[in-house]
Amino acid sequence: MSSAANLPSPSPSPPIRTDVLIVGAGPVGLFAAFEAGVIGLSCQIVDGLDKVGGQCIELYPDKPIYDIPAIPSCTARELVERLLAQCRPFDPPIHLEQRVESVEQGGDGRWTVRTDRGLVFDVAAILLAAGNGAFVPQKLALAEAVPLESRHVHYSVPRLADFAGKTVVVAGGGDSALDWALALRKVARRVTLVHRRSGFSAADSSVESMRRAVEAGEMDFVVGAIAGLDVEDDALKSITLRHIEGETQLAAEHLVALYGLVADLGPIAQWGLSIHGGRVDVDTSNYESSRPGIFAVGDIAHYPNKQKLILSGFHEASLALRKAYSYAYPEKKRVHVHSSYDAKLAEKVSAAG
């Protein structure tokens, strides 16, 4: 029997061919997918996160949004759900946990785009709707934390079962920290939530649930900042907390630090684009970058008097895609049709409903 090492390497999958690759599955990226379908462009979406919604869902899923036209108030989660429903008639494929790594333009003007997990796309245009770039966890500024990552120090909770019967400290004051502390208390031997102050940036309902759990003796809450980790035999033993009264030690086998996400342009910064303050410079007539065929919309776009509003991103995506059409179909002249009179669109919406 041949060993795996002696078997021929599997041939790589052929590139996925589409008109536009949308980088980012946040609100602007989702609306762009709908708008692409409306004007006759095929598209696919990639996002480095494990869920649709981008910054909205990662940072403030249940916070109200008041400045979306015709929607007096909705949560970020509700907005994302509505945008998903809106683009459903065109059923755009969405590839999650795929970070775009490299782009290369061929002699025919089309782009080859590769992700960190092996997907390859052959596209006429690229629409960057990646918010402030990829989001990465804000990590502890402690050297001793690095060798413990994924074993005793964590920046996410892949599986609750991994913490069964353990002493766990959850650090942070946002929705993610409180929600995971509440979930972990059901499987861990003991859970302690640590935050630098007694106030939180989480939803009121989460804060109330946490306080009830503390009062019931189901978990603990301590005000303080993590100042150090006590490591013994390559394992976490305790955490040093700094607070007004001084320093104390808190026993812990696992530390889950949920300080939120920080923006990182990542490989996009190496694409040869004109960048200003971590954002991509664009021409406001069509939101095209300094490299023709690559567009930037939403928070990642930079231009004079730029407003970081979801509404602005919708407008930017609409204009960018109309220019992208000329790259996908250079021989065609696109004819504008108001959506009210677009019979094909009405048929698709009806079928999806």
From Swiss-Prot:
EC number: 1.18.1.2
GO molecular function terms attached to this record: ferredoxin-NADP+ reductase activity; flavin adenine dinucleotide binding; NADP binding
Cofactor annotation: FAD
UniProt cross-references to Pfam families, sorted A to Z: Pyr_redox_2 (PF07992)
Record text on cofactor binding: Binds 1 FAD per subunit.
Domain of life: Bacteria
Subunit structure: Homodimer.
Protein name as annotated: Ferredoxin--NADP reductase
